Amino acid sequence: MASVQSACIRFLLSRANLWNKPIAEIRESLKKVKPQGIPSGVSEEFAAINGVGCKVMIPAEGLNNKAILYFHGGGFCLGIYHPNREFAARMAKKCGVKVFMPNYRLAPENPFPAALEDAMAVYKGMLLEGYSAGNIVAAGDSSGCGLLLSALLAL
């Protein structure tokens, strides 16, 4: 009889090809995910920060001099989709600050260091817009965290 661990591994390996599709097809599939919406008390805007498009989640009440710079995950090849927006909106509401989500250039169309250049441009743009470095909290998930660490090393 197989162990529980080997049964789990066999199950996971049998599903390994779920993401083995062309990137364009995966992107289209993600667009079809039904959004849960953003919480009340948060609005969403699009802004160009230093030439890079960003989704900005704005809490109805909060601090105007502090912000979160949040880099979404997605293997550097998937854009901002509903779960990212919803998470950023909840962060904005809970923390009471704007959350900036750069729509950084994606691979493979834009190879490294394109995403890093966009991340740095948004950070520098936030400084130019009056945020002090000490009032910007950087966050990320999955590959977004890798992008964040790369940006910190580049500073």
Across the structure, where does each feature detected by a protein language model lie?
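A generic structural signal for alpha->beta connector loops
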Residues: 41, 51, 96, 133-135
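A glycine/proline-hinged amphipathic helix-loop "lid/cap" segment
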Residues: 1-62
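Short amphipathic alpha-helix adjacent to the substrate-entry channel of hydrolases
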Residues: 82-102
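Short beta-to-alpha linker loops that shape the active-site pocket of alpha/beta-hydrolase fold enzymes
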Residues: 103-107
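Serine-hydrolase catalytic-loop signature spanning alpha/beta hydrolases and amidase-signature enzymes
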Residues: 75-78, 83, 99, 125
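Short strand-loop-helix active-site module centered on a catalytic nucleophile
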Residues: 54, 69, 91, 112-155
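Short beta-strand element of the alpha/beta-hydrolase
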Residues: 65-74
